[in-house]
């Protein structure tokens, strides 16, 4: 429609190939879109493999862009369109060096929370398997997920874990899951038995889920 548009994103965190396809499609559009909602709907029709949503808040826009999605700012509109074209650099799912086995699965958790969650769900295809996503760290805004099987895990333990995570007052999880672990089990007295177990193996984590345990996953950390 002759309007200028600006793309706002972080280099290295988005899929440039997909982004170039979107730009080519938008350049071919025939105009007639007088509302930002019309442009969003046009993108969702023509580029069905990308999730598009509107964003009216500046702080929310900045947070989303820093997480990987790309924002489209169209001249004349007060809202922005967020396109989920994230692609984070990651390594393959290798067997953890400290938990090597001669038989069984050879994969291990990686530094991406979404990949780790999918690895768990691939093993436990139960609709009662639940992931609760939280944000921790005023500066890092790290994704932290509580994972459990509804009906197996104790509600009191789930609620206590949820409360501790939501009440954490830190600027960043500098040591990833290690920092999270220390804040979750912080006590003023010594416990003779371990109350927490750390693993980098999806099969071990899933076996604990089936026994009613709760998993806490942090983005940027392969340890659960």
Regions found by a protein language model. Give the residues of each.
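Membrane-embedded alpha-helical signal segments
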Residues: 1-224
């Amino acid at each position: 429609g002759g309007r200028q548009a600006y793309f706002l994103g972080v280099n290295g965190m988005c899929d440039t190939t997909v982004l170039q396809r979107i730009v080519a499609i938008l350049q071919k559009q025939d105009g007639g879109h007088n509302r930002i909602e019309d442009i969003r709907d046009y993108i969702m029709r023509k580029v069905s493999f990308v999730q598009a949503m509107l964003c009216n808040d500046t702080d929310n826009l900045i947070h989303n862009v820093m997480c990987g999605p790309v924002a489209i700012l169209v001249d004349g509109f007060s809202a922005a369109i967020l396109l989920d074209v994230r692609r984070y650099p990651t390594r393959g799912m290798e067997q953890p060096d400290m938990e090597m086995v001669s038989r069984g699965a050879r994969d291990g958790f990686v530094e991406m929370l979404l990949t780790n969650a999918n690895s768990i769900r691939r093993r436990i295809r139960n609709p009662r398997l639940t992931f609760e996503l939280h944000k921790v760290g005023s500066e890092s805004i790290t994704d932290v997920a509580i994972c459990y099987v509804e009906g197996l895990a104790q509600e009191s333990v789930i609620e206590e874990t949820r409360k501790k995570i939501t009440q954490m007052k830190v600027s960043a999880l500098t040591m990833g899951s290690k920092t999270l672990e220390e804040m979750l089990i912080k006590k003023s007295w010594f416990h003779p038995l371990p109350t927490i177990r750390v693993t980098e193996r999806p099969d071990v984590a899933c076996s604990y889920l089936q026994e009613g345990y709760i998993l806490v996953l942090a983005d940027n950390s392969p340890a659960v």
